[in-house]
């Protein structure tokens, strides 16, 4: 009989550097975001099979906008999730759920599903996040090294080098016990909406990172 995902997999906190190969070469964004918490998905006998990272959002306005200024320090973003395609169905949902449960209580987590990449956020829907609508499409300053636009040189002219930022579905999750979740939920500034429907388009994630990494303590 085939083992269940919890029997085969374990989720363990990992140092940020252990995610870098996955994020730079396997995730479509091809860059390393702010990382405050990082988790590895380990399969018995098969090593590291995925990484999930959380960090402070690039925009301070986003932190204030979710639940107000008094709660802005509690806002973190699930900014990267990568799982090998060879993993069983529903592995990503299991990974996200276990990672969320391992975070400190009382945090406000936001994450985005990029409509331009054909994503609707099924993993967030299956792990009971709140859907709060889609961001507006906009353009940002394009930086040649693929770093975030907040790192641009203010002394240079970027008027001809702007990049389209496609609309993204926005999801919010509250960590902790019922009281902590209730306190943060009442401060949510966005209306909770029905989950969007549709099919998810896959991107090329064929790169094979080092899966034999182990956690050093």
Name every feature range the model reports, one short phrase each.
Residues 1-34:
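Short amphipathic alpha-helix that is part of the acyltransferase structural core
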Residues 10-14, 55-163, 173:
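Acyl-donor binding region in acyl/amide transferases
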Residues 23, 36-56:
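Conserved beta-hairpin
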Residues 36-38, 126, 168-170:
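Extracellular structured ligand-interaction cores
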Residues 158-185:
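A conserved mid-domain beta-alpha-beta active-site/ligand-binding segment of alpha/beta enzyme cores
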Residues 183-217:
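Short, cationic low-complexity segments
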């Amino acid at each position: 009989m085939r083992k269940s995902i919890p029997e085969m997999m374990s989720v363990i906190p990992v140092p940020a550097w252990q995610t870098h190969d996955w994020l730079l070469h396997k995730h479509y964004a091809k860059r390393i975001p702010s990382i405050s918490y990082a988790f590895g998905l380990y399969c018995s006998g098969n090593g590291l099979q995925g990484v999930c990272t959380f960090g402070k959002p690039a925009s301070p306005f986003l932190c204030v906008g979710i639940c107000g200024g008094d709660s802005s320090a509690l806002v973190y973003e699930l900014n990267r999730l990568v799982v090998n395609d060879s993993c069983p169905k529903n592995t990503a949902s299991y990974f996200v759920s276990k990672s969320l449960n391992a975070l400190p209580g009382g945090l406000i987590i936001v994450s985005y599903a990029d409509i331009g990449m054909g994503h609707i956020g099924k993993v967030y829907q299956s792990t009971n996040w709140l859907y709060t609508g889609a961001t507006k499409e906009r353009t940002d300053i394009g930086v040649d090294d693929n770093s975030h636009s907040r790192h641009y040189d203010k002394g240079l002219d970027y008027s001809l080098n702007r990049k389209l930022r496609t609309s993204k579905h926005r999801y919010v999750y509250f960590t902790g016990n019922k009281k902590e979740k209730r306190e943060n939920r009442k401060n949510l500034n966005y209306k909770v909406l029905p989950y969007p429907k549709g099919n998810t388009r896959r991107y090329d994630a064929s790169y094979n990172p080092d899966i034999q990494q182990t956690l050093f303590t």
